[in-house]
């Protein structure tokens, strides 16, 4: 396996106004080349800090990171030539229009004019920005501005792309256009390190994922591996006149609008589903989603904040 990013024992402590924050407490990660790797975790977990270190914008307090075999601390120049970054907070150059933003970015990276023009045209169509090509970046809506940043980076020929929440604030259609663009980048044998709070997105795009919590890697693996690593990997949604007490023997129960949600092991999940069907209650059984896993591992107990669970039976 070719490695795009190899991090060992990476720590980072921020010091400001006499206060110390340990943002990374020892991160080991191996990101294979030619695939999308997802970093997920709660706000403040350390994802952006890791991306800034691996993309040579921030020095680690200790540990090492190599990108495509080049040391990010000792040899940042070699790394910078081969990567492109969408930072979490980005302010594109406001006096340019959308076309210029993308085209000049590619030129600045050393791409010949003809190639830069061809790629700019293609990415503007791909991300539905073509009709806005002459619009000043400062006149774009927030989501369109974000798309323009995504366009710049995806049109580049960088081998490793660091995308820190590229789809935050995008409408559902635009989000899927970005997914397609990321998938195309992977077909071109590039590597994407992605952070996102949309766990359906993390699951749809990533070959592997790391769940970061408190500056450490809590879990790492393929989405399926991660989903199977919780004690109760199935979710059963039951509607109808069933009490919490009746459901408790089957697993972990949460009351949701119109019914109950039970997280259970496979056997119990099947049994409960059969029983509910026999009684004529609407029921559905499915593997736990990545979001379920996330909530079970790093969230509050299920049910405390589960507003989306309605009408899924
Ligand atoms: N410049 C800074 N100075 C001091 N503390 C910082 C700085 N940047 C980040 N931190 C702290 O480091 C920790 C990790 O932050 P980081 O931005 O890496 O988290 P994140 O996982 O990207 O979160 P989010 O999902 O909200 O983007 C947090 O506790 C944050 O407050
Ligand atoms: Mg962040």
Model-derived features: where do they sit?
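ABC ATPase "signature
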Residues: 220-221
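A short, flexible loop at the N-terminus of ABC-type nucleotide-binding domains that lies
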Residues: 1-7, 13-26, 76
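Short, charged/small-residue-rich alpha-helical element at the C-terminal edge
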Residues: 232-304
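A short, proline-enriched helix->beta-strand linker immediately N-terminal to the Walker B motif
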Residues: 155-159
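Catalytic Walker B motif of ABC-type/P-loop ATPase nucleotide-binding domains
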Residues: 161-165
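Conserved ABC ATPase "signature" region
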Residues: 103, 107, 114-132
């Amino acid at each position: 396996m070719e490695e795009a990013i190899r991090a060992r024992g990476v720590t980072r402590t921020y010091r400001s106004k006499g206060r110390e924050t340990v943002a990374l407490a020892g991160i080991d990660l191996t990101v294979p080349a030619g695939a999308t790797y997802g970093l997920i975790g709660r706000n403040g977990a350390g994802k952006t800090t890791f991306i800034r270190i691996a993309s040579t914008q921030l020095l680690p307090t200790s540990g090492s990171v190599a990108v495509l075999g080049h040391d990010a601390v000792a040899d940042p120049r070699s790394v910078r030539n081969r990567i492109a970054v969408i930072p979490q907070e980005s302010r594109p150059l406001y006096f340019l229009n959308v076309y210029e933003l993308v085209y000049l970015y590619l030129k600045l990276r050393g791409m010949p004019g003809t190639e830069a023009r061809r790629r700019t045209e293609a990415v503007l169509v791909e991300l539905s920005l073509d009709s806005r090509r002459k619009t000043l970046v400062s006149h774009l809506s927030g989501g369109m501005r974000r798309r323009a940043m995504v366009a710049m980076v995806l049109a580049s020929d960088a081998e490793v792309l660091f995308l820190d929440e590229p789809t935050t604030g995008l409408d559902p259609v635009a989000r899927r256009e970005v997914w397609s663009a990321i998938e195309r980048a992977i077909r071109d044998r590039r590597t994407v390190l992605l952070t996102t709070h949309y766990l359906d997105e993390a699951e749809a795009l990533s070959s592997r994922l790391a769940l970061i919590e408190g500056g450490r890697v809590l879990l790492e693996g393929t989405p399926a591996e991660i989903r199977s690593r919780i004690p109760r990997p199935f979710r059963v949604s039951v509607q109808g006149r069933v009490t919490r007490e009746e459901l408790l023997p089957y697993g972990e129960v949460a009351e949701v609008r119109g019914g109950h949600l039970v997280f259970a092991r496979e056997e119990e999940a099947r049994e409960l589903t059969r029983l509910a069907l026999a009684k004529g209650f609407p029921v559905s059984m499915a593997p736990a989603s990545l979001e379920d896993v996330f909530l079970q591992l790093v969230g509050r107990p299920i049910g405390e904040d589960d507003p989306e669970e309605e009408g899924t039976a």
